[in-house]
Structures are given as structure tokens and as C-alpha cells.
Amino acid sequence: MFKITEKDGRKIILYGEQNRDFCLIQPTDASDEEKLSSLLQNLSALTDRTFCYRRVNIPDWNGEMSPWPAPAVFGEEGFSGGAKATLEYIENLVPYLKSEFNLSDNTKFILGGYSLAGLFSLWRGYESPIFSGIRGASPSVWFPDWDKFTDKNINADYVYLSLGDRERKTKNKTMCKVRERIEMQKEKLVKQGVPCTLEYNPG
């Protein structure tokens, strides 16, 4: 079902046949691997379109997913702002995937992630036009200065956002901004003419 390979020193998990309608790329850490089968089953149940899935391992989560440096929110580990290098790696991965899996020019690439990877996916949408769709599941839109960054136009045809309905109830002064920020994010995208779905889910 899955193929595990390595590209430029990073572990990549591949799923799906060749010549698909969509290609979803998801940056994750190792803890998400055990949830992969259920994720793909859920995706398959939600659409009749063909898709393939590429999971990219991110060993330094706070460093490689953060768009710019920021102080720690939980614990002592801050954010070093290494997302630019990760973006370059993923952009270079796209032509490799097109060649390796016979993806046509009509195949649409989607970048999606959870938490800080959701923020990274949104940030990438502002920085590069390669991905037609962006998925941010509980994206870390509380990130310092994110509200100012999103005043510019995004390079995406569609954006999906979701948030757990209990996430704003945290006592952390930074994290409690998440609902206000994600609703602001959707409002800005809609004003830019970008179709955007925002869903609140249990949790």
C-alpha cells in the first residue's frame, strides 16, 4: 500500500497510483505515521477523484516549519524560522514526483498540514504559486505577527481551514487568540476572492 523512499536525506512515504487528478503533499513528524492508514481511508471516502499522497518527514518541527524566528510558547524550545529551506525542498520535490509517478500537467498539487505544518502550508501559499490548494488543519495562526503577514494576497485557488472547538479555551495568552485569528484569516481570503472553507470540529 505504501512505498517508503528517501529524497535528499529525507524520508518520504508515497501512496497511490500513477497519473492521478490530485497530489497531496503533507509535512509531518514521525508520530503521525501510525495515523496514516486511517487518514487515507477518510480521504478516499470523501471524494471520487483520484489522488496520490506524499508524506515528507520533518525532524526539526519547530525549526523547519516556522516562517520566522519567534520565542517559545510551550516549554523552552523556540522557533528558529527555517521554513524557507523546507519550502525549497518541497518545491524541488514537485518535478521529481511528476517524473517518478507520471503526473500530468493537469494534476493539481495540494499542500496540507496540522498545527505548525498547517501554518507552514498557509505561509507557502503566500510565498509560491506551485500549489493550487492549501489545507490548514488547526493551523498555528496564533504565531507572532501572522495577522500582519496575511495582509498580502495568497497564491492559491482554494483554502481549507479547520479548528477544534475547544482550542481557544486554553489559558495560554498566545494560543487563546487562535479562533479570532483563524476567522480573520478566512475573512481576508474571502475579500481577496479566494474560496475558503472554515470548519469547527470536536476537540
Task: Show where each model-derived region lies.
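A conserved short beta-strand
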Residues: 130-142
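Short beta-strand immediately N-terminal to the catalytic nucleophile in serine-hydrolase-like folds
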Residues: 110-113, 137
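Serine-hydrolase catalytic machinery in alpha/beta-hydrolase-like enzymes
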Residues: 8-11, 15-102
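The feature captures the conserved acid-bearing segment of alpha/beta-hydrolase catalytic domains
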Residues: 140-203
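Cell-envelope and extracellular/periplasmic
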Residues: 19-22, 26-30, 98-101, 116, ...
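Short helix-loop-beta connector
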Residues: 104-107
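A conserved amphipathic alpha-helix that caps or lines the catalytic cleft of carbohydrate-
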Residues: 40-43, 125, 186
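Gly/Ala-rich beta-loop-alpha elbow adjacent to hydrolase catalytic centers
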Residues: 112-117, 121
